[in-house]
Amino acid sequence: MSVTALGMMLIAYLCGSVSSAILFCKITGLPDPRLHGSGNPGATNVLRIGGKAAAATVLVFDILKGMLPVWGAYALGVTPLYLGLTAIAACLGHIYPVFFHFRGGKGVATALGAIAPIGLDLTGLMTGTWLLTVLLSGYSSLGAIVSALIAPFYVWWFKPQFTFPVAMLSCLILMRHHDNIQRLWRGQESKIWDKLRKKKQPEDEDTSPEE
């Protein structure tokens, strides 16, 4: 492993460790997402406690903190395997942030951003898969799970040299969604539309962790 690759992985982890949800909520006076809603510091929980605009802002920053380090590594000539490990490092930072006591989100938006430098066509397919699944089912978590399952096959078709690291990244995302998978199986998972309705009601949100 080159010093450049190692350095970019460290930078990616530190970028991922900057929790957009926690910082945005603190700056704008919204409740701490770790203590309200599902307790998950991610865009979907911010949707619940802060509304669409707040969630969209957090989503954009979560995507960028995965995208920028990987693009930087790509520009520096890092090989495909270590590009993939850089992407994983960014997601690990989001999931286990060193700046926030290693309590982070589930890494879906950051993973999407990290995959973006591989190709915009692939990014479009991943986004379309998530959107289609959510529109058909109403479950944000199911969209993430389906996208993670199918991502290695998309990558194998477009850029096969990245298949192995993306498969590892998909496994990480699926592991973070094991509670959601169990609730989906039991029919206990809440739909994304419910979060919008609960935002209009007093703070009696359910505590089931989503995206």
UniProtKB/Swiss-Prot annotation:
Annotated GO molecular function terms are: acyl-phosphate glycerol-3-phosphate acyltransferase activity
GO cellular component terms given for this protein: plasma membrane
The catalytic activity, as recorded, is: an acyl phosphate + sn-glycerol 3-phosphate = a 1-acyl-sn-glycero-3-phosphate + phosphate
InterPro entries documented for this protein? G3P_acylTferase_PlsY (IPR003811)
A Pfam family matched in the record: G3P_acyltransf
Query: Topology relative to the membrane, per the entry?
Result: Multi-pass membrane protein
Principal subcellular localisation of the protein: membrane
- GO terms under biological process: phospholipid biosynthetic process
As for subcellular location, the record says:
Cell inner membrane
The UniProt record lists the EC number as 2.3.1.275
- Judged by the first EC level, this protein's enzyme class is transferase
Instruction: State which residue ranges cross the membrane.
Output: 5-25, 58-78, 80-100, 112-132, 138-158
This protein's UniProt keywords: Cell inner membrane, Cell membrane, Lipid biosynthesis, Lipid metabolism, Membrane, Phospholipid biosynthesis, Phospholipid metabolism, Transferase, Transmembrane, Transmembrane helix
Pathway listed: Lipid metabolism; phospholipid metabolism
Q: Which family does it belong to?
A: Belongs to the PlsY family.
Quaternary context: Probably interacts with PlsX.
Say what the protein does.
Catalyzes the transfer of an acyl group from acyl-phosphate (acyl-PO(4)) to glycerol-3-phosphate (G3P) to form lysophosphatidic acid (LPA). This enzyme utilizes acyl-phosphate as fatty acyl donor, but not acyl-CoA or acyl-ACP.
Q: What is this protein called?
A: Glycerol-3-phosphate acyltransferase
- Which gene carries the instructions for this protein? plsY
